[in-house]
Every structure is written in structure tokens, then in C-alpha cells.
Design a protein with these regions (language model features):
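Conserved SAM/AdoMet-binding glycine-rich loop
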Residues: 18, 304-452, 456-460
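N-terminal [4Fe-4S]-dependent radical SAM core
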Residues: 186-266
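Catalytic cores of alpha/beta
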Residues: 395, 459-475
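Iron-sulfur (Fe-S) cluster-binding segments and ferredoxin-like electron-carrier domains
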Residues: 280-297
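Glycine-rich beta-alpha loop elements in corrinoid/cobalamin-binding modules
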Residues: 1-211, 218, 518
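Conserved, mostly hydrophobic/aromatic
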Residues: 98, 233, 277, 298, ...
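Terminal amphipathic helices with adjacent charged low-complexity linkers/tails
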Residues: 123-148, 161-199, 213, 222-225, ...
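N-terminal pre-triad scaffold of radical SAM enzymes
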Residues: 249-281, 299, 314
Length: 562
């Protein structure tokens, strides 16, 4: 199908890690793939990125191959692989690609293309932000660390546009982190901590990881895009259509790409997330800095949507990783980058967080006033703790009045405060305050609208007793979810590190070791926790009995089933 490219093959496995796409949280094959033709499963191979690169290498020996996207970005260093229950090497080495782009990649790909055009091979490109490269020569690493000219390729001080010397941090080697031993897991946790501390373009250092006789080097992340650059990217002539080859029915009789329906009439207003939930890898991919589009850009895109023959008057979403983040968390982030050892939100929100929904309110008002727009929904998730920190309740009222259709989906995730701490979520009390305020505002507006909370079963830190706490709260509120999300240890998240190591790299004990974390690893205990969160299902009653007996809380059975 392809000829040999002029510059390089650019390879991605899609908008989701191929193993996540192909398998459920309980490691069972999925019955469908929303990103494939007709929603059929089986169109994308397991470990797709490695498979694709191997096929290209076989067909076009000596061609530049550059990998990017979610699968590449979140597997850029040694990482725990849930599906094989092992620690795997950097995907840059396993795939045998020449260069890896991590993060969103627009800045990096332009610089790389220019260097390729000037005659460099991909293996020779080592000075581009947002990339990982490798070498088998220790002399290359020594030269890099001793060089004086690397400074002009790295840290940019945004206040005066001068350059600053970078540090070089050697991560624990693959050999040190790969084993299932306490010592190896301590090293793994340390490696993850260092990686997480170096995801900000301003203050990140250069990371080096040794694997056998080779070294993987991560250059600092790309600088955040300006509003003007974001606008330029999203003004490109995207068709909002699948390729015509998918118009014909697949073997299951269905045509098209199902996943498109959710995003076809949605607007991406921002990138990045300073919420940094432990179970989410967006921070590892996009960083904590918020990059937002202008109102003009979003209104123009929405206006174009209204001309689409399939548009029914409804904009499905206006958001990003977190819908109500439109600005950096604080002024310090713009100057010094996101703090390495402090969270913006969570159980103890930083006092420097600058809370405002004014810009988002104005944007939503403009979108509502576009001719032929009947309703503007918000579906990509509201960070309710941030919302509750805002003393101005204008957005909360506008949200209930204009942007919900009967129910609002939110993610408290748990009720046990220790589990919430490990999740980096707010305390349960904050959710209850939010729930009360939501009810009050809707009553004031004369609307009957409901909250649909999402909960995770089996997250690191959650034992059976913690799951019982959730069950009791659900009984008290009269809401039991139809769907419960089982914790899924996917590459790149803090929670996955906790799952593998049973350690919390974000907290140290007095002796310098990392805090120990309880982890439900057996499939049966995960089923027990899930059953507790759905105790109302008749088929779960025996599992609930078993769970209550195991954690010594048999008395709860009468409360749940009275």
C-alpha cells in the first residue's frame, strides 16, 4: 500500500493503547473495538506499535521509523505490563524504532521533519524536546553530560527567553526494576517518582535509563503550546468523518467507526490536567499545564459544525481532560513549572491554586448563542472539588441550568478517605458538600436532575472493608450504580506503579522506604469488591456474604438487605 517515504514512517497504534483496546480490566478479550471498522474486534493486533514497526522494518530496511501516540508515550521507559504481569523494557527498544515522540508532539514533529530534510537520520536526532532516543555507546552519554552546547537545546526560561543548564538524572536500570522482589520494586517506585517529577517543560531534567548495554534518553517535554498555536492546529480542515473505506459494512454488517459518534460534535477547549488523579495517565502524557484555545477559535469551529448535515443542534461536549480547567493552576506554574513534590488538588489542595470559572462561563454563553445550537452539553468531566473551591457560584448555576440533560456524571470514585488520598482525590466530605449544593441549586431552578457517580473497585489501597464503606454509603443514598469500573493497571499511571510494587512513591516512611499500600490482586477479591458496590444484584448476594465474613463485618448484611 505504501511506498518508501521521503523522510520517515510515523507510526502510532491509535487513540488507545492496543492492549487496553483489546482486553478488559480483568484481562478478558473485549467483544468489540469502538475504534475499528463496524466496531468489530480483532482488527488491531496486540502490542500493535511493535507489530507495525516490525512489518515496516521487514518491508523497508534502513528507513527512518518514528513512533508516537499513547502507546509509545506511556511506555517510553521500563514499565509494568499488566497483561503479561512483567516489567517490560522501553517500547523504543522493544519495537526497534529509531526515535520516540512523547506527549502531543506537534512541536517535536516539525523540528524532526526539518532535521530529516537537512539530511540527518532519525537515529542522529538527539536535541529535540518531547523525544526519547537511544544509544549503545556509553561514550555518547558521557559526551552528552560533559558537553557545553546542550544548554541551547533544552531548558527555556520563559520570563526572559534565556537558557539554563539541565541536570542529568540516571534512573534505576531495567535490570534493577524488572524483578518481582522487594528491592526491585523499591527501585521501580523510585524510577516512577523521578519520571513523574520530570513531566513539566520548564523544570524537567534529562532522564537516562540503562537497559543491558543500551541507554534510553528522555529529553525534557515540549514547551506548552500558546493559545495562538492551539487555535492554528484546530483550524486545520478536519473532516469529522471516517475514511470512505469504512462506508461499506464490516463482517458484522455494521459500517463506520463507532467511536466517532461521541466526538463528532464535541469541542476540545483545552489540554493538560493539574488534577493528576493516580489512576489516570493524562498528566504523564499531556502534563499539568493547561493549554487553552481562544473563544474565537471554538465559536468558529462550533459554527462550522452547525453546517454539517448530521448536526441536530446539540454540541455534545466542550472540554478536555477536565472540562472546567481553562487556566494554569497558579501563577507559579507559568514561571517555574508545576511543583515536583506538591499536588494542586487532592485531599489537601494547595493554597496557591487560583480558582476561576469566569472564562469558561463566558465561552459557554457564546456557544449557546450560536444560531442553530439548541443545547451545549458538558460530558468530559467536571472536577467537582475545584468547582466547590470557587466562591462564585455562577458556573455551578449555569451548569445546572443550561448544560445538563437530566443527569450529571461525576467521579467521586470512592468514599474511604485513605483510598481517596491514594487516588489523589478530594475527601468524601467535599463530594457530599457538592451533592448537597447540586440538589439545592436544581431545586432553586425548579429542575429535577440527578447525579450519577462513578466508583472504582479494587484501586490500590482499597481492601474489602473500604468497599463495604462504599456499599453502606450507596445504601444510605439509595443509589446503586449499574456499572462499576474495575481498576485497570494501565501504563503510565501512579496507581499502576502502586499496583505492581504495593508501594506509594509519593510518601516515604521514617526509615526512607516508601509507604506500603494494600493491593487486591487476585481476581476473586476484585470480584468481591465489585459485588459490594453492586450489592443490590441478586447474583452478588453470596459474594457479598463472603466479603463481609472475610473482613469481619457480617453485621452489615442486615443493613444492606433490609
Amino acid at each position: 500500500i505504501f511506498g518508501k517515504p521521503r523522510l520517515a514512517f510515523l507510526v502510532s497504534s491509535g487513540a488507545m493503547d492496543s492492549m487496553v483496546s483489546n482486553y478488559t480490566a480483568n484481562n478478558k478479550p473485549r467483544s468489540e473495538d469502538a475504534y475499528a471498522h463496524g466496531g468489530e474486534k480483532g482488527h488491531r493486533p496486540d502490542r500493535a506499535l511493535t507489530t507495525y514497526v516490525g512489518a515496516i522494518r521487514q518491508a523497508y530496511k534502513g528507513t527512518n521509523i518514528i513512533i508516537g501516540g499513547i502507546e509509545a508515550s506511556l511506555r517510553r521507559f521500563s514499565h509494568y505490563d499488566y497483561w503479561s504481569n512483567t516489567v517490560k523494557r522501553s517500547i523504543l527498544l522493544d519495537s526497534k524504532a529509531d526515535l520516540l515522540i512523547y506527549g502531543m508532539g506537534e512541536r517535536a514533529i516539525i523540528e524532526i521533519a526539518n532535521q530529516l530534510k537537512d539530511g540527518k537520520s532519525a537515529r542522529e536526532i538527539r536535541n529535540v524536546r518531547g523525544t526519547c532516543w537511544y544509544t549503545g555507546k556509553e561514550s555518547d552519554i558521557n559526551a552528552l553530560q560533559n558537553s557545553t552546547d546542550t544548554t541551547e537545546d533544552y531548558r527555556v526560561k520563559p520570563d526572559n527567553d534565556t537558557f539554563d543548564k539541565k541536570q542529568f538524572i540516571h534512573l534505576p536500570s531495567f535490570e534493577e526494576v524488572k524483578n518481582d522482589s522487594p528491592e526491585s520494586k523499591e527501585k521501580y517506585a523510585l524510577s516512577y517518582l523521578i519520571q513523574e517529577q520530570n513531566t513539566d517543560a520548564i523544570n524537567a531534567d534529562i532522564l537516562i535509563e540503562k537497559t543491558d548495554s543500551r541507554f534510553v534518553v528522555q529529553n525534557p517535554p515540549a514547551m506548552p503550546l500558546s493559545t495562538e498555536e492551539m487555535d492554528k492546529i484546530y483550524s486545520l480542515p478536519f473532516t469529522r468523518k471516517w475514511h470512505p473505506m469504512y462506508d461499506k459494512p464490516a463482517a458484522n454488517g455494521k459500517s463506520g467507526i463507532p467511536a466517532l459518534s461521541e466526538v463528532k460534535f464535541s469541542l476540545t477547549s483545552c489540554r493538560g490536567c493539574f488534577g493528576a488523579c493516580s489512576f489516570c495517565a493524562i498528566t504523564f502524557h499531556q502534563g499539568r499545564r493547561i493549554q487553552a484555545r481562544s473563544h474565537t477559535s471554538l465559536v468558529e469551529e462550533a459554527t462550522k459544525m452547525t453546517k454539517d448535515k448530521d448536526f441536530k443542534g446539540y454540541i455534545h461536549d466542550v472540554g478536555g481532560p477536565t472540562a472546567n480547567f481553562r487556566n494554569d493552576a497558579c501563577e507559579n506554574q507559568k514561571i517555574n513549572g508545576a511543583c515536583k513534590n506538591k499536588d494542586c488538588l487532592g485531599v489537601n489542595p494547595c493554597k496557591n491554586v487560583k480558582v476561576s470559572h469566569t472564562d469558561y462561563v463566558e465561552l459557554l454563553q457564546k456557544l449557546r448563542n450560536i444560531p442553530n445550537v439548541k443545547k451545549v452539553f458538558i460530558r468530559s468531566g467536571i472536577r467537582f472539588d475545584y468547582l466547590m473551591m470557587d466562591k462564585d457560584k455562577t458556573f455551578f448555576t449555569e451548569l445546572c441550568k443550561h448544560h445538563i440533560s437530566g443527569q450529571l456524571k461525576v467521579a467521586p470514585e470512592h468514599v474511604n478517605d485513605n483510598v481517596l488520598r491514594l487516588m489523589r482525590k478530594s475527601t468524601h466530605k467535599v463530594y457530599e458538600q457538592f451533592s448537597d449544593e447540586y440538589e439545592r441549586i436544581n431545586k432553586e431552578l425548579g429542575k429535577k436532575q440527578f447525579l450519577v457517580p462513578y466508583y472504582i473497585a479494587g484501586h490500590p489501597g482499597a481492601d474489602l472493608s473500604a468497599a463495604v464503606d462504599v456499599a453502606l454509603y450507596l445504601k444510605k443514598t439509595g443509589f446503586v450504580p449499574d456499572q462499576v469500573q474495575d481498576f485497570y493497571p494501565t501504563p503510565g499511571s501512579l496507581a499502576t506503579c502502586m499496583y505492581w510494587t504495593e508501594l506509594n512513591p509519593r510518601k516515604k516512611n521514617a526509615d526512607g522506604t516508601f509507604e506500603k499500600v494494600y493491593v487486591a490482586k487476585g481476581g476473586h477479591e476484585r470480584r468481591l469488591q465489585r459485588a459490594l458496590l453492586q450489592f443490590n444484584k441478586r447474583e452478588n448476594m453470596n459474594l457479598v456474604k463472603e466479603a463481609l465474613k472475610l473482613c469481619g463485618r457480617e453485621n452489615v448484611f442486615k443493613i444492606l438487605y433490609k
